[in-house]
Regions:
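Short beta-strand-loop/turn "lid" adjacent to the catalytic site in phosphate-handling enzymes
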Residues: 65-101, 129-135, 164-185, 208-211, ...
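Residue-level signal for inorganic ion chemistry
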Residues: 23, 46, 76, 103, ...
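Glycine-rich phosphate-binding loops at beta-strand->alpha-helix junctions
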Residues: 13, 211-219, 239, 265
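A glycine- and small-aliphatic-rich helix-loop capping segment at beta-alpha/alpha-beta transitions
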Residues: 19-26, 88-98, 145-147, 252, ...
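Short beta-alpha connecting loops at secondary-structure transitions
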Residues: 38-41, 96-99, 285-295
Length: 344
């Protein structure tokens, strides 16, 4: 039989799912990792921990699928949390952890961009709201407050690009992820010169933009052996998790919106052309060059639920572990018994 594997590089875990070609789930695996909040407004992850979670989750589903010799994995395709940033030196050694979308240390610099009017100019070309989540703002923070790291940095990638670099030694970024950086012109599908000038970067410090359908073959023999797949298994770059969520629930027709709540939340619609809000309130990210996802986010979704579980419901968390059930399922069941109009 033929199979596909879907991978989601999420904020708190990496998930891999093995499907048959009828869409039936054959096996799945999720591997978590911490979000480091060592300082105020910090929200970082360890790229090595995420890479190891990917390898472990892929290994799990391949083993659980019990594939026979004549079975074939036609491809491994990715979705990824957007807006992450990692700085590398000339030898591709990471100089930072993964600075995630949830990191707010660049707030000062996003506000300066807004107040100067330059932010609106950049937004009108990139479709990314001027916000501390965007790599545009993160780069300004690095440039001004982490100058030693900034000066040593020769490459800037997101988490998915780091994964592909580890597996294939490539330096590419799909246009969906690129469109969420605040550095990418969504009208000419290339890095925006004004954004590069403001951050002090050159194009060769950023990955080559590619279509979400771009395929890599010839992965590291070491990791192919660990996972249990052929070296020439196709790996597809895929796109950002937000745009792909619309595709996943088939919310791609005019007038159809998708609401998703993960660690964060958003409401999105799909259009055939980029749509820019004159007041800079909405985002416009690529699904591919012919489909654009327009919407608005909220930065606290499931993240709030996790905080409540970890800080307010220790007893329920322990009870769930003893019962062998998911702690979120237990809390949801308890919450469902609260009558309507209970004021919280």
């Amino acid at each position: 039989m033929d199979y596909m594997i879907g991978v989601d590089l999420g904020t708190t875990s990496t998930k891999s799912v093995l499907f048959d070609l009828k869409g039936h789930i054959i096996a799945s695996s999720s591997k978590g990792y911490p979000l480091y909040r060592d300082k105020p407004d910090m929200a970082e992850e360890d790229p090595v921990e995420i890479f190891e979670a990917l390898i472990d989750s892929l290994t799990d589903v391949v083993r659980a699928g019990k594939l026979e010799n004549d079975d074939k994995i036609l491809g491994v395709s990715f979705s990824s949390a957007m807006h992450s940033l990692i700085a590398f030196d000339k030898d591709w050694k990471p100089l930072t952890r993964v600075i995630t979308w949830a990191d707010g240390r660049a707030f000062k610099y996003s506000e300066q961009l807004k107040e100067s009017g330059v932010g609106q100019e950049i937004y009108s070309k990139t479709g990314t709201p001027i916000h501390p989540m965007a790599p545009l703002s993160k780069l300004l923070w690095l440039k001004n407050e982490q100058q030693d790291i900034y000066k040593k940095s020769k490459h800037f990638l997101g988490i998915k690009e780091y994964i592909f670099h580890r597996l294939f030694k490539t330096n590419k970024m799909d246009i969906s992820i690129a469109s969420g950086t605040g550095l990418f012109n969504i009208f000419n599908l290339d890095w925006d010169q004004q954004a590069l000038q403001i951050t002090g970067l050159s194009k060769d410090q950023l990955p080559t933009p590619v279509e979400p359908y771009e395929i890599e073959r010839g992965m590291s023999k070491e990791y192919a052996k660990v996972i249990g797949i052929p070296v020439d298994t196709p790996f597809i770059y895929g796109a950002g998790d937000g745009p792909l969520s619309n595709l996943g629930v088939n919310a791609i027709q005019p007038g159809v919106a998708a609401v998703t709540i993960g660690t964060s939340g958003a409401i999105r619609v799909v259009t055939d052309k980029p749509k820019i809000d004159p007041k800079g309130r909405t985002f416009t990210y690529a699904l591919d060059r012919n489909h654009w996802v327009v919407g608005g986010p909220v930065n606290n979704g499931g993240d709030v639920f996790r905080w409540a579980r970890d800080n307010l419901f220790d007893a329920e968390k322990s009870t769930a572990a003893l019962l062998g059930i998911d702690s979120y399922d237990l809390l949801t069941e308890i919450a469902s018994k609260v009558p309507a109009g209970a004021d919280g």
